[in-house]
């Protein structure tokens, strides 16, 4: 009998001061609440999503790059959110470089919109946008702030309600990773994010797009193709190919330590994943008043399966 697909449970962060970190996020995203789960301090979002925290003695590393790039929220009005953040002295808003002679904006809708389904433009496409007087939309868009412990946090609008909505990943091969999540964990592919042509294990490895795009947190732009995505419930996992030439490292012990999915029958999942050759990082263990197991994803991301009956 097929196992019901997991749902997203939590993102797990390492922090020098979990209580201060949670307070920071509650002030920025006020539909969230400070809570506890499994004996750990936690942030609770209104869509039944948690961010759990472990206290660490030293700043949690954010490099070398792991498979987890950042996490983010939907907001009803991203431009109003930016203006609100501007007035808060403990918020550091991060510039998005536009690829236009060092120009930068705080929200993507203040520069040229993406094209061809990509959230950015190459320098050649920027030149074309200038030549044809393509205007910024000045509505919605995405931006970033620096969170506690050097976390990278995205806010994106305009959406019906504020909620935790995604964990953005890097993968060695995004389409292969998408297949892995579908095959082993029953992930869904969000509407509009299916590959342009059917992908198989024989065809999922594709080269990284040659051109960087803007806006981007890096002055030199970022590679946005190929792009893939999966989802568990209403939490999405979009992904790009890793940006540099160094292989991604494991997530354990880093700022973004792992993410967790809720399953109904842990023993059945352990048996299934074992039969499928999925790597176990930790055998089943107690987690609060339930049990969990830690597996490894296709780009060395640690994934916790939490039994929730």
How does the language model describe each region?
Residues 21-26, 85, 150, 177-182, ...:
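Conserved active-site tyrosine of GNAT-family acetyltransferases
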Residues 1, 86-169, 191-231, 238-242, ...:
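Vicinal oxygen chelate
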Residues 68-70, 256-257:
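Eukaryotic phosphotyrosine signaling hubs
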Residues 5-37:
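Mature N-terminal segment immediately following signal peptide/propeptide cleavage
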């Amino acid at each position: 009998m097929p196992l019901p697909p997991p749902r997203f449970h939590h993102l797990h962060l390492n922090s020098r001061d979990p209580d201060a970190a949670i307070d920071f996020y509650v002030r920025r995203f006020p539909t969230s609440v400070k809570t506890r789960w499994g004996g750990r301090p936690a942030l609770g979002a209104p869509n039944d999503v948690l961010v759990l925290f472990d206290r660490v003695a030293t700043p949690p590393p954010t490099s070398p790059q792991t498979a987890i790039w950042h996490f983010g929220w939907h907001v009803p009005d991203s431009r109003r959110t930016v203006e609100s953040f501007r007035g808060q002295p403990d918020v550091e808003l991060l510039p998005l470089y536009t690829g236009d002679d060092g120009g930068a904006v705080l929200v993507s809708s203040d520069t040229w919109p993406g094209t061809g389904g990509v959230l950015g433009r190459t320098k050649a496409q920027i030149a074309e946008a200038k030549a044809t007087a393509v205007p910024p939309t000045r509505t919605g868009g995405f931006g970033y702030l620096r969170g506690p412990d050097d976390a990278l946090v995205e806010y994106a609008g305009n959406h019906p309600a504020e909620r935790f909505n995604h964990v953005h990943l890097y993968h060695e091969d995004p389409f292969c990773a998408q297949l892995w999540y579908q095959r082993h964990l029953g992930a869904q592919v969000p509407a509009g994010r299916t590959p342009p042509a059917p992908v198989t294990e024989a065809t999922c490895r594709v080269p990284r797009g040659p051109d960087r795009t803007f806006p981007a947190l890096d002055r030199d732009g970022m590679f946005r193709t190929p792009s893939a995505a999966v989802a568990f419930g209403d939490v999405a996992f979009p992904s790009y190919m890793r940006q540099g030439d160094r292989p991604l490292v494991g997530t354990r012990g880093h700022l973004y330590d792992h993410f967790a999915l809720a399953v109904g029958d842990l023993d059945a999942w352990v048996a299934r994943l074992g039969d499928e050759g999925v790597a176990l990082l930790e055998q089943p263990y107690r987690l609060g008043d339930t049990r969990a197991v830690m597996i490894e994803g296709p780009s060395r991301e640690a994934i916790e399966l939490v039994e929730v009956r």
